[in-house]
Amino acid sequence: RTHAMGVDEIRETVQAFADAAERADRAGFGAVQLHAAHGYLIHQFLSPLTNTRTDEYGGDFEGRTRFLKEVVAAVREVWPADKVLGIRISGSDWVEGGWSIEETVRLAQELQGQVHWFDLSSAGIGDTYEGPQGPGYQVPLATAVKEGTEGIVVSAVGSLTGAEEVAAVVDEDRADAVCVGRAALANPNWPTAAALALDVPSEQVPMARQYFRAKW
């Protein structure tokens, strides 16, 4: 049965994030990403649609972002400063009264200097989806955060599958990077195919070692 987390449970969970980051460091990972999107726990604290708490972890912006900020602080205690710490966040719930892009930009500004990377997705909370759809539909969220911050790498995601459209997002300075999911699942050699499609010099094309001799 679901229930609102008690303060002791919140503190235990914050520590669990830190413990996981410490294990990732020992395992040799060079980056970790906190998942604050798609209706998962951190997102549930951020969104007014799910966070109806009346204590210090609910209510206004400061209360609803407190859990994430405590997680970031705890992870930073154990995660090496020379390794990447990122956050994937739903930039908007796309539902009236939900978490908004304005709040996302404000949060990113407050976390400048504490995280290296913001990865902008959207939605995941609410019974309906009222947002846009189609290739690049979430890119404006990344652009808003990029324009509102300094010193943070901002990546865009969502229905970006073609080499030209991915390159355009970066070339036009709408985001610093693009995360490709479904296209990479369909073709694990997507980076190579994209580089060839964009006429990248062959010596710069990323190539799996087993394909090197054939150059494909």
Located regions from the model:
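Flavin-dependent oxidoreductase catalytic cores
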Residues: 1-216
